[in-house]
Structure formats: C-alpha cells, structure tokens
Amino acid sequence: MGMALGVAACGLAGCGDSELSAEELEDRVSEFSDASDRVDALDRTSSAVVEATPGAATYQGYTGLGNPDQGQSDVALVGETTLRVDFGADTISGRADDFIGTVDGGRTQEYDGSLVLSDGRLGVLTANSISAGMSGTLTGDGNTVELVDADLLGQFVGRSAQGLEMVDPDAVVRVNGDREDVSVAVIGER
C-alpha cells in the first residue's frame, strides 16, 4: 500500500510551475505521507475484533491517484477523504475531494469535483476485508479526469480497527477523454 501512495506523493513533489504556493503543496504531500506511514505501521486488525466492533465510525484520510510504472506520472493527484464505516450493517461509504496535483506535467493546482465510494462492503473475503467501487470527475488546469473504473480492496489495521487501507493497482481514468491506467489508494484513520 505504501508504494502506491508514495507514487502519487513523488509525482506531486516533482512538479514544476504551480498555481499553489510551494508550502501548500508541501503540506499536502507531507500529511499524505505521514498518514500513509502511520497506517502502514499498524498490524492487520483481527477478524474477531472487526466482527465485535459496535456502531459506526468516521475515518479521515487521503485518496491518491497515480501512474506507478512511469518515470514521470501522467496523473498525480491527492485528495482529502472522509469515510463512514457502519460495523453493524457491514458497509462503508465516503468521498474524496479537495484534490491537489498535476496531469500530463501541467501546473500543480487544485482540482474541483469529488470521487465517491459505491457498493462499499465489509467482510466480503474475511471479516476484516473491505471492498468498494470508486468513481467521479475532477477538473483543474483545463483538464478533466474521470475515474471510471476502480475496484478497491483493503483491510482494517490496528488493534481496534483505528485505520484502514484500500487499493486498486489497475484502475482506469479518462483524462480529457483518453484512457489511462492508474493506481488508486485510500487510507483513513479514526
């Protein structure tokens, strides 16, 4: 998981002309990287703990989109994410917005729009597993980035499910109508 998130952060750190201040971009990349490191450092939550967790919880975190197999990413975007997990109903929902990044080596700037989770389920593979679709449209710097196919799989981490991580290394976006393969990673902490 850390590698997928690192790709988007590296793509952002190497950007050139920017409509945002260097400090704003540095802060987002740092927050993203720090949250990723914290979640990656936690052990997998046991299925018994997830099954016994009552009620609902809100997780705050980040969603990153990037092209991990290229020297210079064509897409490198990071957004803030809010997720709601209902442990009783075995569902997860949420959205990512407030994206910052670059597309096709363009300027680093804010991207409007949001990406939304759909069909979010807990316990599909094991009691600890998470699955969800994600789609939506982001616009900025004259570009339209439409996430058309992301099937996220993940897990809870930490002794009391204080974190979660989901990834799709084979997601599809359309950038100004052209198909691009990207990796999508979602992390959250409560």
Please describe what each predicted stretch is:
Residues 15-190:
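Mature soluble binding/inhibitory domains
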Residues 1-15:
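Sec-dependent bacterial lipoprotein signal peptides
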